[in-house]
Amino acid sequence: MQPFVRQAISSDGGELQRFEVEARSQLEVFRGGFRLANELPLVGSLWAERVISPRWTVFVAGFDDVAMGYLCIDYAAQRDAPLIEAVYVTSDARELGLGDAMVNAAIEECVRRGADAIDAYALPGDRETKNLFERSGLTARLLIVTKKLGK
């Protein structure tokens, strides 16, 4: 099996949509997951457009010619650093280095674009994602705490 990481292309749209649905189904397990899912619009059938937009970089990774995960970077102008908005690897391909390879590719792409930092989301309790980012040198810089009021 040969691993690969590459920038996504329009024809990856169907796979990206499937990965997005799988990833979102797992968000509810973690504190804040439901709220994060509500704050990040579902891309759905618009992945083909996202992968060609200059605002985004989307990577896919897998083995041989089978994609098994994705990572999405948002370069929105209102942020002071590009944001890894989503990273997901299918459960049967975890612990094989695909997530690490995509995070490293994301860092390289952000450096190439002249960024001096990169941010990423990791939910409380999601140790796999936190550890993935920490292996690449990303560290926590902000925790947002919430208390629901009334209603």
Each predicted region: which residue ranges?
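A short helix-loop-beta-strand connector motif used in the catalytic cores of GNAT acetyltransferases and
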Residues: 45-60, 83, 139
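Conserved active-site alpha-helix within GNAT-family acetyltransferase domains
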Residues: 100, 124-142
